[in-house]
Regions:
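N-terminal, positively charged/glycine-rich alpha-helical extensions of SAM-dependent methyltransferases
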Residues: 2-37
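Conserved alpha-helix/loop element of class I SAM-dependent methyltransferases that forms part
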Residues: 47-64
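Short glycine-dipeptide loop
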Residues: 64, 161-167
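Class I SAM-dependent methyltransferase SAM/SAH-binding core
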Residues: 68-126
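A conserved beta-strand element that flanks and buttresses the S-adenosyl-L-methionine
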Residues: 137
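A short glycine-rich, Lys/Arg-flanked "PGG" loop and its adjoining helix->strand segment in the class I
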Residues: 151-163
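C-terminal alpha-helical "lid/dimerization" subdomain adjacent to the S-adenosyl-L-methionine
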Residues: 170-216, 223-224
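Core SAM-dependent methyltransferase catalytic element
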Residues: 216-219, 223-237
Length: 237
């Protein structure tokens, strides 16, 4: 069944996948198991640079009307976006019931008057029905997938971004050389092993996110590195 679903997706987006390139997504993956400690783990691993990196270009997001956030986790970025943009309406998608609950709790506590501007949806991205948006945000989300599925997602983003729409991506990056090149590779490997053990995640290495985005005719507007190049926030149009 999974093979049929993903082959159908690939066909619909013009991508042919060989048997050894099958998109590996296990719908039994449960990020509920890490929801309670997600912010702590993220902060500990990166000395809070993961949270900081997500906000690199939030000041550029003050005029958009509609936004899709995929894999939004516990709602840190969502809170900051609502504070920056006083009129935006956000569709907030996460596969974890507990992550969604944490995000709702955060906004209820920090920005209670803004809850009406957020639609919380608990679904896997392959089950989500896209609409059209001024902004699509993927913070530490695309690293959960292999190149083939990231390609499908980026093509879909292209279809569903409005004219002059923005694509906002923050994720891990391997520095080209030096100590941080090797230490980041080891750190990312440890994270994938940990997440694989907890959630049954099958991906073992970072996808080539930037290359895939640029191949789909997005233009890089802004880019900034954190944690000596191990984390990057990129803003595309």
């Amino acid at each position: 069944m999974h093979k049929l679903i993903y082959n159908a997706l690939a066909t619909s987006y013009g991508v042919k996948l060989k048997d050894n390139q099958k998109i590996k997504m296990n719908k039994t993956q449960s990020y509920d198991r890490i929801a309670f400690g997600y912010d702590f783990i993220a902060g500990l691993f990166s000395f809070n640079q993961i949270n900081k990196s997500q906000l690199a270009f939030v000041s550029h997001l003050s005029t958009q009307g509609t936004c899709l956030i995929l894999g939004g986790g516990t709602g840190y970025f969502l809170q900051k976006l609502l504070e920056e943009n006083k009129t935006i309406h956000v569709t907030y998608v996460d596969a974890s019931v507990k992550m969604i609950a944490s995000a709702q709790k955060r906004i209820s506590k920090k920005r209670p008057s803004e809850l009406y501007r957020v639609s919380f949806i608990c679904k896997h991205v392959e089950d989500f029905q896209f609409e059209n948006y001024d902004l699509i945000v993927c913070n530490y989300f695309l690293d959960l997938f292999d190149d083939a599925y990231v390609t499908l997602l980026i093509e879909r983003f292209k279809q569903h971004l409005k004219k002059d729409g923005l694509l906002y991506i923050t994720d891990f990056s391997i520095p080209e050389k030096g100590f941080m090149h090797w230490s980041t590779k080891v750190g990312v490997k440890i994270l994938y092993t940990l997440f694989g053990w907890i959630t049954s995640l099958s991906v073992q290495h970072l996808p080539n996110i930037k290359s895939i985005v640029l191949q789909n005719n997005f233009v890089l507007l802004e880019s900034v590195a954190f944690f000596k190049g191990a984390l990057k926030c990129n803003l595309y149009k």
